[in-house]
Structure formats: C-alpha cells, structure tokens
Amino acid sequence: MGEGKLSRRAAGWPSSTDSTVIEMGPGAKGGAGIGDAMPDAVTTHDLMAEYKVPMDVFTYHYYNGISERLESVMPAGHWQASQAHTDDYLAMAGLCARSYAPIRDKYMPGAQMWVTESGDAGGGGNTWGSTYLDVLRTLNELGDFATATDGIIFHNTLASSDYGFLEHGTFNPRPNYWAVLLWNTLMGTTVYDAGVGGHVYCHSRRDGKDGYAYLMVNNDLENTMTVELPGEGTLYALAGRDGMRSSVMTLNGKELIAGAKGELPDLSGVTVSGSVEIAPGSCAFVVV
C-alpha cells in the first residue's frame, strides 16, 4: 500500500510553472508478464482517479517475467529458456501495451506511453538475458510496442546484472546492445502496417530517404523464413555465433565485438535482391 499512499499524496501537488517539466505517471505495473504474478494493492484506475494535475505521459513498468533468482518465490511469473523464442513469450510486451492503452485513453487521451523500466525478467534478468536468445524478445518488443502506441521504452539496465546491455566490469557490449543500436540506426519513427502476420514490422527509414525499413524476427528454430523483395535492399542479418545462447552476436556472419579502445565494428549491411532467406532463430533488418 506504500506506493498507493505516496501516489495519492503526490496527486494533489500543484502543477509546475516550468514549461520544460513533463508531468508523468502513474508508473503502474500489471497487464501482462510479471505484473500478472503480482497482486494489486492499489489499481491503476484507483491511482489515476486521484490525480488532480493533468499529466503529459502515461507510464508503466514492464518485465516479461521473473528471473531464475526469484522463481522459487513467484514460480507463476517465470518462463523457462526453452520458451524464450515462443509466440506466447514474445507476445507479452504487446499485450501489456494494449492493456494499458484504454486506461491511457481514458485519463490522458492523446498522450504517449513510456515504459519507464523494462527488461526480460525482474530480479536481475535471466541467465540468457545477456545472450543472443534475448535479442528476439528485445527487438520484437520494440516492434510490437510501436504498433500499439507512440512512446519510449527505457531499458533496465545499462551495465548491471544479466539484463545489462553492457557486461558489468568490462563494459563490453552484449548482443542486445548491438540489436538496439541497429534498431535506432535503421528504423524510422513513422510506423506502417507490414501487411503480413508473424513478427514483421515496417517503419520509415531512419536516414530520411524514401523507402521502408523492415524488422523480421524468425522465432521458428527449425524453419527458414523467405522474403521476396521487389528490388534491391540492404540486409542486416543477426544470429548467435555459437547458437541461441551465444554471448556473441554476428551481423551477416561477422562477429560484433568492440575494439580494444571501444571502437565500433563494421555495422554495414549487404546488398540483396529477389528472395532473401532469414535463417531459423535469426533476426533481420531489411532496408529498401
């Protein structure tokens, strides 16, 4: 009840006179993933009904589940590594966003939604959170979230525990770091209907040129996904160097490892046309 009491007190605070301040809340949890395994002391509707200050951004926290560290405490919230590529697992982030969208629309119509804390699993992340296996979830979360709402996802954390984008102590980039870097480099901010099922997402190009940038997540570990391009495109194919739980990711077959002084590796794509095969368990960006 502590969170609820704090939020109720804050609800009566006067609005800031600083025009640069963004009012946001309520920092909710639930709707899918870890939230479904945690009882609600105060509901999101209860919190929002108390606010007297108009807010600019609707916020919530989201994790896909509970890590191995907390499995014994909250077994219903834990996913096994064997499930981390499944449609059910990958669907959780989008389900959460869509469960909050009607609440946002009721109390803050037109506002963005910000996920102010997110990761693969609460409790430090799963042991595979630092490997290529979690890239499928990370990229699919970005793609699916963008089809549900305009907003921002804040990842927890940069360099701590299993879900850190950087390895603690060495600061060496992990697979998710490169995946998100490529997302931000290639995928623009205008979202289109990809027109197909599965885990395929279509945006404008980040470079501002005419055309489209696609993200394709082939979460089938046995079958290849085949894509027909209308012309030439640029392919950025991602895979685990040594399998799904590899600590090193490859881009078009080349290892993504930072240099001794932190230099970025070559992140260039390769030119493709006609039929493009997306290997089992791999992810790909295609810019056309």
Briefly describe each language-model feature range.
Residues 112-205:
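Aromatic/acidic polysaccharide-binding cleft in carbohydrate-active enzymes
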